[in-house]
């Protein structure tokens, strides 16, 4: 985002032409054209001359006067001003003619003429900073010319606009040089006619003979440039401190290049820049600390909107420095602590992978461009892998998605993050961040965010919102020949012109640069919000989206506004400033005679600030939260290109997509430049960052619930820390007393105690600050979420459920299926099972402060599964020792023990009334055990190999997995005597896996189940249609655990190598991390995740995506001596606090509770 004023000084690099380089500036005096040189002297103006590659600028010290730009292409000559004939006839004269006898003395013989001396122009291949040849060595073999006739001074012409009255020489010319040899009589005669120069007597003066001068920034205002035409007038200057010939030689080179073809000129100037860069090295005296060790120094350029500034990059062991090749910036040398760099992203620039953007902890950023991809990658690896210790974790993308889903990150911040990740940056107008149109109502007097009609349909691109216009686009699409790339939209939703269309009032310099010194036609200017919306809704040439400035929250500071994606300093940025003509810019008059001034706002907005505030509220509304993932699919996701883009009516011109053309392969400079210009004009589609449907945001009720749990955990953490702090203080006090009593005997002990106490205090202080900050952030988010109405919550929940089903390709007969479920539940009201249902009814709350209660040795081998009864008094467990055990915690004894078969028992499911247990065994069978009878009541041969996992849902569906690679779906029944039976023939038998099935789980609504295989694949099945929905490769090793979150929208998967992933039911990865050791089991309530490994327990928050350390939860370290192979978390019905059961490899069960 841009600040209101780009620079504190008037001249900035945006005043130059595209592709122009700034070289140097010098203190100078300008002598305005006047009738006499004495008058010019009296009117002299102090300022600075700025030498650039395509023009020379003069910036007066008086800000009321305009900056003057002299393009080299409009100059006829540059040279030293010696006298009135300094800008006399050109050095390159016409074809020589005999000297007229009337000029020569008839009484004297005709002298032998001396050929004139001409200045040799530098060779195009010579370095621009090489020393020019001396005048004495520059001669031209020209025969005796006819001497020119002196031309009388013509009357002073009038410029096309108001300007100082100039004296004009009508003859075009080039520099005239004086020969070091004795002049000929002819030249002597000419010199006698030259008038002495008053200015030349005052010092070294040079002139610029130009036919055009461009004036800008008069009174420091950003008005359109004034182009003044002259008849080759002499503009005279002098330098204050530098030798004149040094600067003139360089300017003459640029003047010579201005007459060449653009491609050749650009190449020559590029050589000059490279030559200068090679001669400039970093000034090591500017190091912040002279003890810093230089690691890497190389050439690069700093990129900002419409500007490229070459310079030198130095990386030390402590800081990163950028030294521009010029001194245009107020603080020429920039240095950044490596510790302040929090993110480094590789960028494209000019369609090449040569950019690198660095983000700092104060919210600022630095965009650097390198000569090639190899150099860019070298710098990236050096910073990310070796020097910058505060770089965010590689799984940051998943962490952001998780936080957004849970409401910790706002929609605004998440969209900024996705833009950033997709290569969009505030430093490059060709890749500026893109935001969606949200509101569709710009006529009502009040903005009703509770009406769906108020919002734009986010599931469709802008071009598809109007069906009539879409039909036009589709007709054109079908008319494009098959051998040509097809597209729906010939224009894009984001281009530099569109960005400045919105921001012209805030950064007019950029519009003037883009439009060659003029503002756009008044009828095309940004005039009214409603008018612009109607245009993007109806015009066949306008499908532009919005920019972040429309939604910037009022509480946002510059340090937090862009996720490190900002441009210049915008501490004084006022929301909505881009909608007001605060500089009184002359933007023009429309055809309807309306003057363009401030933007006309919709009736429901009282001011620009109110307008931005209401748009931000709309962006954060529940409707947008539940539908924003559709727009993300269009812009950043799987509907961005290819067949999905065609189906979504979201296909743009092929050159807008990344990778559509290899710009490096175009060797012809004309074609390459044309291609770059074409793509920049068409716009660039963001980098595709999602290949699968983007997960939906959690409903507001669930977000609030997770935030409440997180807040409760943080508060308990702080209480725990304060308790520890108090204990430390008490210990210190006791130690002090002991010191007083036993000062001579306990010195060593006291020192150790004080040292430990200081360490504890430092740790505690750090944790207090971190937790207080977290509480403040979550409290503010929680309060913001609570402002929405309950009706809106209910509506969003129903919409969320529908969206989830539709996004997975389910048929639109969910009502029939739901009715069938209701009937099944009515008939078998008492047949429900532990698992998702019980966890869904009660969240665990905090697990941070569990404490070890007792250990029970029940089995001889690894415990494969275990559950705790509803009343928290009975433990059920099965083991690889082939035994089922039932243990009474109240009686502290084993109630049942049954050896079902000769092989291991892998899993079991428990009925809610706890009267029946369904067990899977390695002997290929599925058993139903009656707790009351203490015997097997039913069994069936389930698979052709070991049954590895079972899952039973309350709609009488049992799913089983096996080592034979199959997954089977069974229907269960309750017999007249209350016993459970399983149909002998499965209703579905899936053999989609190539390896054994390791884990199975069913969503809470009973519509989907997932199976994980030992080769790392995850299979999604529809329980309604009994069909495979999708197959995803999750890991490269054995997938050991699957667990649906209670809301049914996400699946937790774990690999034996310690990797854990949270995946949306649409198949997108939401969050991932890795723990130490091999994972064997896990459990979750959707907010917390507890994992059992061969090194004990791990605890993670699924709200913030952070690990709960054992410093806060001591029970985690207490479990580290055990290899945990099964676990179960339940709620104690009497205390309403969680109880954790863990089963070990040795066959023992541990109980943890608060």
From Swiss-Prot:
Name of this protein: BEACH domain-containing protein lvsF
Residues in WD repeats: 858-897, 900-939, 942-980, 992-1031, 1034-1074, 1076-1110, 1119-1154
Low complexity composition bias: residue spans: 779-788, 795-822
Biased composition (Pro residues): 145-158
Pfam family, one: PH_FAN
Residue span, BEACH-type PH domain: 289-384
Domain BEACH: residue ranges: 389-697
Keyword annotations: Repeat, WD repeat
SMART domains xrefs: Beach, WD40
Endpoints of the signal sequence: none
InterPro entries for this protein: BEACH_dom, BEACH_dom_sf, BEACH_Domain, NBCH_WD40, PH-BEACH_dom, PH-like_dom_sf, WD40/YVTN_repeat-like_dom_sf, WD40_repeat_dom_sf
Keyword Repeat: yes
Gene name in the database record: lvsF
Stretch list, region Disordered: 92-123, 139-167, 554-575, 739-762, 779-825
């Amino acid at each position: 985002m841009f600040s209101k004023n780009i620079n504190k000084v008037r001249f900035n690099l945006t005043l130059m032409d595209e592709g122009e380089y700034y070289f140097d500036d010098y203190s100078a005096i300008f002598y305005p054209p006047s009738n006499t040189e004495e008058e010019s002297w009296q009117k002299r103006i102090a300022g600075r001359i700025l030498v650039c590659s395509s023009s020379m600028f003069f910036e007066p010290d008086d800000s009321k006067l305009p900056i003057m730009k002299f393009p080299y292409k409009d100059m006829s000559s540059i040279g030293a001003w010696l006298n009135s004939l300094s800008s006399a006839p050109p050095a390159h004269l016409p074809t020589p003619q005999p000297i007229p006898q009337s000029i020569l003395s008839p009484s004297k013989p005709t002298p032998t003429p001396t050929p004139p001396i001409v200045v040799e122009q530098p060779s195009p291949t010579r370095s621009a900073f090489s020393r020019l040849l001396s005048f004495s060595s520059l001669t031209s073999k020209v025969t005796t010319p006819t001497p020119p006739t002196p031309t009388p001074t013509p009357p002073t012409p009038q410029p096309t606009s108001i300007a100082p009255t100039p004296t004009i020489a009508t003859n075009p010319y080039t520099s005239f040089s004086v020969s070091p040899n004795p002049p000929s009589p002819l030249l002597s005669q000419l010199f006698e006619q030259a008038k002495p120069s008053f200015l030349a007597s005052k010092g070294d003066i040079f002139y610029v003979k130009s036919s055009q001068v461009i004036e800008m920034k008069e009174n420091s205002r950003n008005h359109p440039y004034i182009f003044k035409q002259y008849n080759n007038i002499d503009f005279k200057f002098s330098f204050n401190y530098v030798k004149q010939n040094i600067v003139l030689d360089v300017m003459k080179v640029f003047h010579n290049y201005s007459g060449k073809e653009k491609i050749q000129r650009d190449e020559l100037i590029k050589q000059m820049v490279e030559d200068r860069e090679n001669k400039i090295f970093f000034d090591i005296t500017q190091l912040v600390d002279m003890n810093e060790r230089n690691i890497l120094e190389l050439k690069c350029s700093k990129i900002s909107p419409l500007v490229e500034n070459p310079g030198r990059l130095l990386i030390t062991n402590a800081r990163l420095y950028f030294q521009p090749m010029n001194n245009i910036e107020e603080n020429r040398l920039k240095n950044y602590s490596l510790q302040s760099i929090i993110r480094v992203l590789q960028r494209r620039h000019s369609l090449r992978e040569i950019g690198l953007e660095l983000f700092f902890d104060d919210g600022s950023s630095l965009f650097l461009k390198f000569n090639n991809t190899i150099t860019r990658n070298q710098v990236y690896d050096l910073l990310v892998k070796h020097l910058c210790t505060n770089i965010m974790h590689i799984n940051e993308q998943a962490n952001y998605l998780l936080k957004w889903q849970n409401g910790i990150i706002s929609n605004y911040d998440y969209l900024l993050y996705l833009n950033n990740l997709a290569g969009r940056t505030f430093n490059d107008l060709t890749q500026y961040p893109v935001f969606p149109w949200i509101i569709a109502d710009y006529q009502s007097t009040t903005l009703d965010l509770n009406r769906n009609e108020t919002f734009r349909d986010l599931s469709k691109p802008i071009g598809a919102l109007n069906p009539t216009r879409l039909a036009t686009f589709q007709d054109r699409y079908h008319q494009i020949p098959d051998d040509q790339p097809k597209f729906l939209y010939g224009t894009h939703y984001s281009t530099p012109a569109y960005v400045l269309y919105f921001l012209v009032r805030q950064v007019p310099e950029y519009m003037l640069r883009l439009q060659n010194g003029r503002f756009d036609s008044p009828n095309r200017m940004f005039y009214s919000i409603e008018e612009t919306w109607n245009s993007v809704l109806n015009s066949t040439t306008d499908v532009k989206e919005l920019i972040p400035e429309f939604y910037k929250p009022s509480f946002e500071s510059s340090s937090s506004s862009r996720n490190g994606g900002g441009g210049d300093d915008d501490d004084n940025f006022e929301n909505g400033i881009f909608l007001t003509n605060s500089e009184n810019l002359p933007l023009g008059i429309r055809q309807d005679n309306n003057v363009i001034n401030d933007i006309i706002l919709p009736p429901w907005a009282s001011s620009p600030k109110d307008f931005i505030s209401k748009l931000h509220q709309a962006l954060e509304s529940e409707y947008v939260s539940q539908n924003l993932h559709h727009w993300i699919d269009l812009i950043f996701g799987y509907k961005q290109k290819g067949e999905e883009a065609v189906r979504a009516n979201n296909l743009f011109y092929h050159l807008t997509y990344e990778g559509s053309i290899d710009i490096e392969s175009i060797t012809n400079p004309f074609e390459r430049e044309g291609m770059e210009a074409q793509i920049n004009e068409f716009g660039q589609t963001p980098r595709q960052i999602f290949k699968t449907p983007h997960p939906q945001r959690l409903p507001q009720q669930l977000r609030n619930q997770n935030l409440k749990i997180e807040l409760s955990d943080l508060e308990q953490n702080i209480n725990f820390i304060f308790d520890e702090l108090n204990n430390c203080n008490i210990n210190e006090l006791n130690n002090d007393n002991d010191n007083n009593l036993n000062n001579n005997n306990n010195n060593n002990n006291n020192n150790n105690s004080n040292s430990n106490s200081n360490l504890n205090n430092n740790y505690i202080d750090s944790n207090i600050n971190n937790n207080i900050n977290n509480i403040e952030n979550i409290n503010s988010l929680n309060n913001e979420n609570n402002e929405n109405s309950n009706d809106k919550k209910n509506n969003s929940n129903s919409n969320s459920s529908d969206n989830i089903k539709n996004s997975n390709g389910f048929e639109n007969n969910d009502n029939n299926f739901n009715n069938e479920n209701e009937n099944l539940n009515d008939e078998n009201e008492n047949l429900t099972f532990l698992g998702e249902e019980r966890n869904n009814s009660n969240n665990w709350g905090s697990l941070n402060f569990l404490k070890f209660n007792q250990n029970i040795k029940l089995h001889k081998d690894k415990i494969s599964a275990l559950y705790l009864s509803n009343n928290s008094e009975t433990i059920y467990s099965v083991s690889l020792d082939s035994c089922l055990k039932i243990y009474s915690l109240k009686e502290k004894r084993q109630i049942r023990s049954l050896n079902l078969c000769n092989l291991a028992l892998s899993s079991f499911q428990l009925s809610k009334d706890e009267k029946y247990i369904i067990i899977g065994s390695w002997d290929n069978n599925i058993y139903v055990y009656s707790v009351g009878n203490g015997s097997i009541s039913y069994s069936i041969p389930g698979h052709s190999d070991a049954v590895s996992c079972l899952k039973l849902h309350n709609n009488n569906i049992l799913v089983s997995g096996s080592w034979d690679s199959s997954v089977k779906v069974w229907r269960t029944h309750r017999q007249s005597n209350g016993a459970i039976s399983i149909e002998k023939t499965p209703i579905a038998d899936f053999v989609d896996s190539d390896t054994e099935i390791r884990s199975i789980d069913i969503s809470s609504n009973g519509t989907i189940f997932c199976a994980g295989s030992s080769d790392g694949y995850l299979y999604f099945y529809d329980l309604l249609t009994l069909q495979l929905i999708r197959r995803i490769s999750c890991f490269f090793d054995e997938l050991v655990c699957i667990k649906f979150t209670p809301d049914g929208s996400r699946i937790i998967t774990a690999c034996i190598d310690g990797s854990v992933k949270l995946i949306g039911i649409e198949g997108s990865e939401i969050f991932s991390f890795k723990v130490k050791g091999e994972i064997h089991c896990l459990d979750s309530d959707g907010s917390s995740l507890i994992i059992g490994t061969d090194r004990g327990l791990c605890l993670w928050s699924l709200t913030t995506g952070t690990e709960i350390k054992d410093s806060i939860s001591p029970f985690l370290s207490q479990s580290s001596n055990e290899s945990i192979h099964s676990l179960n978390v339940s709620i104690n019905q009497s205390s309403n606090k969680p109880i954790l059961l863990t089963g070990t490899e040795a066959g023992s069960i541990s109980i943890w509770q608060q």
